[in-house]
């Protein structure tokens, strides 16, 4: 399997390129606009044909490369069915499978960080977007986020996965590249709670500043 993890320093965003082998179909998860040419060059170097681009949710801290990649490659653009994005050509439902040339992903609806947040499982790993981070979780105070929904997504959808499941988030701010469900259950400070109310108390009092790109990124990612 080809599995590439790329990093955007400005927004601390991880992008993933996945394919079964050289010369096959590929998909990209959570691409950043400024790196579009890097992605296409890498695809060309590996003789890969991009067929799907997935965004885990409408991002507020960077402009997605989804629309630009669609323009350049004629790939399908994929998000969960709750998205309001006008860029998307395929909306997937909760538990729906995405198949490309030997690779299978399964969509999980995980609202909380935003109301359109989805995670995607693939074999031994899960792409968690901003829902579950390494030693953290996504904020819930904008884009129709909801801390109790986030708690349910975390504890009823993600943390029930096998503990050895690898966690690949959309962001990391400390140089971590991946974790596991077991490690997050044991060590993630935001998951050491006993109820949705306790989790909401933490999340509703973070008092974080809005992302610098929010006023530009959200409209761009909704409208292309």
What residue ranges belong to the model's regions?
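Short glycine-enriched, charge-decorated loop/helix-capping segments at active-site entrances
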Residues: 138-145, 184-188
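Core dinuclear metal-dependent hydrolase active-site scaffold
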Residues: 17, 97-122
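Conserved beta-strand hairpin/beta-sheet module of binuclear metal-dependent hydrolase folds
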Residues: 1-48, 119-129, 135
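Histidine-centered catalytic micro-motifs
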Residues: 53-63, 110-115, 167-174
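A short acidic, helix-capping loop that chelates divalent metal ions and anchors anionic groups
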Residues: 25, 86-88, 135-143
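Accessory terminal helices/loops
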Residues: 152-166, 170-224
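Active-site metal-binding loops of divalent metal-dependent hydrolases
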Residues: 31, 58, 82-83, 113-114, ...
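Active-site HxH/HxHxD metal-binding segment of metal-dependent hydrolases
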Residues: 12, 23, 31-107, 186-197, ...
């Amino acid at each position: 399997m080809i599995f590439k993890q790329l990093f955007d320093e400005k927004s601390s965003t991880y992008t993933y390129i996945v394919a079964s082998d050289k010369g096959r179909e590929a998909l990209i998860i959570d691409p950043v606009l400024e790196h579009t040419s890097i992605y296409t060059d890498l695809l060309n170097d590996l003789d890969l044909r991009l067929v799907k681009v997935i965004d885990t949710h409408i991002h507020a801290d960077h402009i997605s490369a989804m629309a630009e990649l669609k323009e350049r490659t004629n790939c399908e653009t994929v998000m969960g069915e709750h998205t309001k994005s006008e860029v998307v050509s395929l909306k997937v439902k909760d538990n729906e499978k995405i198949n490309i040339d030997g690779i299978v992903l399964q969509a999980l609806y995980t609202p909380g960080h935003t109301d359109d947040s989805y995670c995607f499982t693939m074999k031994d790993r899960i792409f968690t977007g901003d829902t579950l981070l390494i030693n953290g979780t996504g904020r819930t105070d904008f884009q129709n986020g909801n801390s109790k929904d986030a708690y349910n997504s975390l504890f009823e959808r993600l943390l029930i996965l096998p503990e050895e499941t690898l966690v690949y988030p959309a962001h990391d701010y400390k140089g971590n590249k991946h974790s596991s469900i077991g490690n997050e259950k044991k060590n993630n400070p935001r998951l050491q709670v006993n109820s949705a109310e306790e989790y909401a108390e933490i999340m509703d009092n973070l008092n974080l500043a809005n992302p610098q790109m929010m006023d530009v990124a959200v409209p761009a990612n909704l409208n292309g």
